[in-house]
């Protein structure tokens, strides 16, 4: 029990340290991809578990579903060890995305500014989104 508490304390401190040190999110994402590959066998050991998998190919539109599946996976996975750091990193990524979404709040601007934003949005959509049919 002491060992587990010590381990959780270390994980908590590392999470606080990562946030305080403002580790670039790109570094956290790369580390998380590596951890995901390393723990894939453990995470897929429960073949009866069913998780929501978006059919849409534009991942940025399905963030809610992705994190809903992640919560289910987290609750059904044996905790502890290095897999705990994977879930810590995924939690940091979710918090980052939530903070970015807060910037979507509406602000009243002139028509020209709105059209500039719309044009930029459509440009991203035409080059970075997988278009269906």
Swiss-Prot record:
Keyword Signal listed: yes
Keyword field: Cytokine, Disulfide bond, Glycoprotein, Growth factor, Secreted, Signal
Glycosylation site positions: 46, 75, 89
Domain of life: Eukaryota
Signal peptide: 1-20
UniProt entry tagged with the keyword Cell wall biogenesis/degradation: no
Coiled coil region boundaries: none
Main localization category: secreted
A GO CC term assigned to this protein in UniProt: extracellular space
Tissue: Expressed in lymphoid cells, including spleen, thymus, lymph nodes and peripheral blood mononuclear cells.
Disruption of the gene: reported phenotype: In IL-5 deletion mice, the intestinal eosinophilia that developed in WT mice during T.spiralis infection was completely abolished, revealing the importance of IL5 for the increased production and recruitment of eosinophils to the gut during infection.
Membership in a protein family: Belongs to the IL-5 family.
Name assigned to this protein: Interleukin-5
Species for this entry: Mus musculus (Mouse)
Organism taxonomic ancestry: Eukaryota, Metazoa, Chordata, Craniata, Vertebrata
């Amino acid at each position: 029990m002491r060992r587990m508490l010590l381990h959780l304390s270390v994980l908590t401190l590392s999470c606080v340290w990562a946030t305080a040190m403002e580790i670039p999110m790109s570094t956290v994402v790369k580390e998380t991809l590596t951890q995901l590959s390393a723990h894939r066998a453990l995470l897929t050991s429960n073949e009866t578990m069913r998780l929501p998998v978006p059919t849409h190919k534009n991942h940025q539109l399905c963030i809610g579903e992705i994190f809903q599946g992640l919560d289910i996976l987290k609750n059904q996975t044996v905790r502890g060890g290095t897999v705990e750091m994977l879930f810590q990193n995924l939690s940091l990524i979710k918090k980052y995305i939530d903070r970015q979404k807060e910037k979507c709040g509406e602000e009243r601007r002139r028509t020209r500014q709105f059209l500039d934003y719309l044009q930029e949005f459509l440009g991203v959509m035409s080059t970075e989104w997988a278009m269906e049919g």
